[in-house]
């Protein structure tokens, strides 16, 4: 064993339980250099940024702010409505507004519905406000449909967070296919790391590949300028070690989700000084089984999805993060928090190679074993907590704007 148990991490309190209050706008936290500029000339190139999910909103918020701060561009923000409520929270938090909402969200919507509705809605939007460049982010169905809609109209596409790969077309599903397809449609590929850039080039993509860093670090550093103080009734950040957990991926539904919940329960029984903070995804396929398994445990705190500032506060105050989220694999290490990834594959191997994250799968025995090691072995914990975060320096958005300037032939900067 190492140097002893991991100390508790105190000093941050979290939000009230369901429902959570709305977040305050970011206004005071946005640096002056990213504040919106005066309205640009009518003839300035139009950049349309399309998003539909909360992770897209978080990762594109600093990009939107950076384009809005540059008077050489007109910027148009279009929402698909894929995850409307959660996107609205993020937009409000960063002081942003949408120019158009396609309002595609429907009960029990399918991937086919999202794709077809987004294609038709974006065709109409592009016809009324033809962009010179369309930006999409990541690997969502919104991103794929937006890239395809732009391609059909022969509008150049820039892909933020390009080049992530698991090399398993169905894991994660549909994200692995989405990002590969977007790569074949885009002309600007904004890779977060050199590994991602190499993946793009190996795929034979057309256009320019640039290593920019990940925009989620830009968003995280903006949000870290705020110091929110929250409370969860019954959760003692001074006396309890808090495990922050998130689960939502389609491939973890069903039996895997049951295994994950069992692992969480066993950890709580093994470590009486430990609490679990679990923001629940709104999808009932995820939400209801976890509520049934964990809802009655006195040290399992189940909340609605956290606003982004609340999530940052939760990461800062937690001891350990267990997640199947891609974004948290990037964000938590920037705050010195070890990440155990509840998946069998990851499109972010840089985190594993750097030692900031570890793939542990979804078997309850593996969850308990890996988390127990970090909760009892200080040396093992510090090795992960102090490892270098490979995902950037917080300047990715500025690099994307400069690349767009070059691509569109805009002088200066």
Regions inferred by a protein language model and the residue ranges of each:
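N-terminal subdomain of nucleotide-sugar transferases
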Residues: 3, 7, 14-81
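A nucleotide-sugar donor-handling region in carbohydrate enzymes
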Residues: 80-85, 182-255, 360, 380, ...
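A donor-sugar binding/catalytic signature common to diverse glycosyltransferases
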Residues: 136-137, 159-162, 189, 313-352
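Active-site and donor-binding regions of nucleotide-sugar-utilizing enzymes
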Residues: 48-51, 56-66, 90, 101-204
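Glycine-rich phosphate-binding loop signature in dinucleotide/nucleotide-binding domains
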Residues: 42, 125-132, 237-238, 271, ...
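Donor-nucleotide binding loops and adjacent catalytic segments primarily
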Residues: 88-90, 109, 226-317
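C-terminal amphipathic helix plus adjacent low-complexity
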Residues: 11, 18, 30-33, 39, ...
């Amino acid at each position: 064993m190492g140097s002893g148990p991991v100390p508790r991490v105190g000093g941050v309190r979290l939000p009230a339980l369901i429902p959570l209050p709305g977040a305050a706008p970011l206004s005071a936290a946005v640096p002056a250099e990213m504040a919106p500029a005066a309205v640009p000339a009518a003839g300035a190139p139009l950049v349309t940024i399309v998003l539909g999910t909360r992770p897209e909103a978080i990762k594109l918020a600093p990009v939107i702010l950076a384009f809005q701060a540059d008077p050489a561009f007109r910027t148009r923000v279009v929402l698909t409505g894929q995850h409307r409520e959660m996107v609205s929270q993020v937009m409000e938090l960063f002081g942003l507004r949408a120019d158009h909402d396609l309002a595609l969200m429907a009960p029990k919507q399918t991937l086919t519905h999202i794709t077809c509705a987004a294609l038709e809605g974006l065709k109409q939007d592009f016809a009324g406000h033809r962009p010179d460049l369309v930006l999409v982010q990541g690997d969502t169905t919104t991103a794929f449909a937006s890239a395809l809609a732009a391609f059909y109209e022969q509008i150049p596409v820039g892909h933020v967070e390009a080049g992530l790969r698991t090399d398993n077309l169905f894991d994660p599903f549909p994200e692995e296919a989405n990002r590969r397809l977007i790569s074949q449609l885009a002309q600007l590929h904004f890779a977060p790391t050199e590994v991602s850039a190499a993946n793009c080039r190996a795929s034979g993509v057309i256009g320019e590949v640039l290593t920019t860093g990940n925009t989620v670090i830009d968003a995280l550093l903006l949000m870290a300028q705020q110091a929110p103080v929250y409370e969860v009734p019954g959760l003692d950040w001074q006396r309890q070690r808090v495990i922050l957990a998130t689960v939502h991926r389609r491939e973890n539904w069903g039996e895997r989700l049951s295994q994950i919940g069992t692992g969480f329960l066993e950890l709580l029984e093994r470590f009486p000084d430990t609490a679990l903070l679990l923001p629940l995804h709104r999808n009932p396929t995820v939400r209801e089984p976890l509520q049934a398994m964990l809802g009655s445990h006195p040290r399992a705190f189940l909340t609605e999805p956290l606003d982004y500032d609340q999530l940052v506060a939760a990461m800062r105050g937690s001891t350990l993060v267990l997640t199947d989220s891609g974004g948290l694999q990037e964000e938590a290490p920037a705050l010195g928090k070890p990440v155990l990834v509840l998946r069998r594959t990851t499109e972010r191997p840089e985190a594993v190679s750097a030692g900031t994250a570890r793939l542990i799968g979804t078997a309850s025995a593996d969850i308990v074993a890996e988390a127990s090691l970090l909760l009892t072995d200080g040396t093992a914990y510090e090795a992960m907590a102090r490892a270098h975060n490979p995902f950037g320096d917080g300047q990715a958005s500025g690099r994307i704007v400069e690349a767009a300037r070059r691509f569109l032939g805009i002088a200066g900067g």
